[in-house]
Amino acid sequence: MTSALENYINRTVAVITSDGRMIVGTLKGFDQTINLILDESHERVFSSSQGVEQVVLGLYIVRGDNVAVIGEIDEETDSALDLGNIRAEPLNSVAH
């Protein structure tokens, strides 16, 4: 059985972590425990008082036990966003 994540290899994905972070990058690999390898990644930090801050992370590993959601990003739509004008409350941590 192949993992649904194989369809995302070498594509731009957004990862929401269980501590409420949003990390965007190119999925380069993963393992059976959903540890993720992202390249050219950055974190999007949301704030209700100012625009989205992008923190460059580069090559980055996300531990599988910290992954809440993974989704593919439409690069055309994403590049059209004016992140400097988007204001939003940061996500809360996942409650177990």
Curated annotation (Swiss-Prot):
Entries under InterPro entries matching the protein: Lsm8, LSM_dom_sf, PTHR15588, Sm, Sm_dom_euk/arc
Disulfide-bond pairs as recorded: none
N-acetylthreonine sites (modified residues): T2
Any Gene Ontology CC annotation: U4/U6 x U5 tri-snRNP complex
Tree of life domain: Eukaryota
Principal subcellular localization: nucleus
Subcellular localization: Nucleus
Signal peptide range: none
GO BP term (any one): mRNA splicing, via spliceosome
Pfam families per record: LSM (PF01423)
Keywords recorded for this protein, A-Z: Acetylation, mRNA processing, mRNA splicing, Nucleus, Ribonucleoprotein, RNA-binding, Spliceosome
Gene Ontology molecular functions: mRNA binding; RNA binding; U6 snRNA binding
Domain called Sm: residue spans: 1-76
The keyword Transferase is assigned to this record: no
The protein's assembly and partners: Component of the precatalytic spliceosome (spliceosome B complex). Component of the U4/U6-U5 tri-snRNP complex, a building block of the precatalytic spliceosome (spliceosome B complex). The U4/U6-U5 tri-snRNP complex is composed of the U4, U6 and U5 snRNAs and at least PRPF3, PRPF4, PRPF6, PRPF8, PRPF31, SNRNP200, TXNL4A, SNRNP40, SNRPB, SNRPD1, SNRPD2, SNRPD3, SNRPE, SNRPF, SNRPG, DDX23, CD2BP2, PPIH, SNU13, EFTUD2, SART1 and USP39, plus LSM2, LSM3, LSM4, LSM5, LSM6, LSM7 and LSM8.
Known function: Plays a role in pre-mRNA splicing as component of the U4/U6-U5 tri-snRNP complex that is involved in spliceosome assembly, and as component of the precatalytic spliceosome (spliceosome B complex). The heptameric LSM2-8 complex binds specifically to the 3'-terminal U-tract of U6 snRNA.
Family in the record: Belongs to the snRNP Sm proteins family.
Protein name in UniProt: U6 snRNA-associated Sm-like protein LSm8
Organism the protein comes from: Homo sapiens (Human)
